[in-house]
């Protein structure tokens, strides 16, 4: 009787193994969930560097007065005076 049973199990091993593995996995999963208990509340995620940078830039923009701008005469002088006028005594 045992040799016949082992021959049948060996022949149909793929069909027997999958349901057994499925049942063992399901029981283990639920047993672990039962032992572990209720999941803790997820911790608050830390902001990414780009999000912190955007927040900082928005805070800087809120603190500025956008009606006060630099005059166009000051903007035309785009290079430092010390570099270009070093050898021109008439402009100093």
Swiss-Prot record:
How is this protein annotated for GO cellular component? Answer: membrane
Just give the chief location class: membrane
- Organism per entry: Canis lupus familiaris
Record PANTHER family:
SMALL INTEGRAL MEMBRANE PROTEIN 12
Q: Which InterPro entries match?
A: UPF0767
Q: What is this protein called?
A: Small integral membrane protein 12
Q: Which family does it belong to?
A: Belongs to the SMIM12 family.
What are the protein's UniProt keywords? Membrane, Transmembrane, Transmembrane helix
Report the superkingdom from the record: Eukaryota
Entry-linked Pfam families: UPF0767 (PF15990)
Report the membrane topology from the UniProt record.
Single-pass membrane protein
Q: Where in the cell is it found?
A: Membrane
Query: Where does the record place a coiled coil?
Result: none
Q: Where are the transmembrane segments?
A: 15-34
